[in-house]
Amino acid sequence: PVDRRQRQMCIRDRCSGAGHSDGYVVYARMSDAPAAKGIGAVYVELERDGLTFGNSESLMGFRGIPSADIYFDNVEVPIENLLVEPEDGFKKLMETFDLERCGNATMALAQASAALEYVTNYVQEREQFGKPLVDFQAVQIKLADMLMKVEAARLLIHKAAFNAQNGLPDILESSTAKCFSNEMSREVTTTAMQLMGGYGYNKEYGMERRVRDAFGWGIAGGTIDIQKINIASAMIGRRFNQRN
């Protein structure tokens, strides 16, 4: 049974939106049940006593998203703030991650798609040796490679979202879409930056920002390597013990 009031003492490091959001959904251990069975979720309002935040972090990318540590020092919340019972908490959290992966993949796709659109226009306007860059076969091949990767990622995301229309996306499809989109976004944005030469490396033209953000999406929401482990687990039909 859950006590009338829940007390939290812990640290959540590198939390997006920390100090900016009006409230926080916090998953924490709430019972002595073994392993993940004791994990539930509560809602903690910004004004709760004992809730404080660390310094705002300066990240390589994601400059528009505040990020900081969250500290819970004897934070008490009423039972009405209980969102997920301990018995179901971890399972529901994992299901939510399946949905988050699709959103993450979409953001990675947006970075790559915007980079491709920008550099496609650039290579038609920029000239070398008396003709546009796009007239060189090496540039044409890179454009084609970038387009194929962008469209493949788009289809994987659409597949995961379409098959989830009656529920949440499945872990195999959402992890596949996220993993491919994350890797693709890094490849496409860095290729676009390279095609632009020094202009791509210049903050004035925005391409270097897309590169920085593209690398961030491959870390947020479960790293690329974690997605590959999820994919392998779904293929085999069981989770692997990575600890023993």
In which residue ranges do the predicted regions lie?
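Alpha-helical interface subdomain recognition
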Residues: 71, 88, 95-244
